[in-house]
């Protein structure tokens, strides 16, 4: 069986909303570069038919994410990360337009503090998690959740980030 080519990121746009830019930049040094590295690491796990042409990571705040969560998921509260896959939309020269990820600063900061981790570590985990959702991974079934967690844990180790699921496994 012939292996499919690995995915390659053409363009990863990182958009930091002006209302939260100071907080994001203060919490995560070299923000754009770190977010791009985490996204590329997650993209490197896929083997789709097409090269990625473009994806966006939008670093926002709770108000915007709450609105998006309400509009698209019917949940009137902020969440840490939302992923909006584009499906199989092809751009110029057959490049796949992967989709968008939106991450809420306030929720990320609260969760990081509650879990005893840095905002940077939690952000990079959510970038990886969000990209895996864009690639079609899900965690609705336990087998797929375990696979997704394994991929995340392996990728995060490359950034010097401890297994984010270790406490959940100990409680189970």
Regions found by a protein language model. Name each.
Residues 1-123, 134-172:
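An acidic/histidine-cluster motif and surrounding catalytic segment
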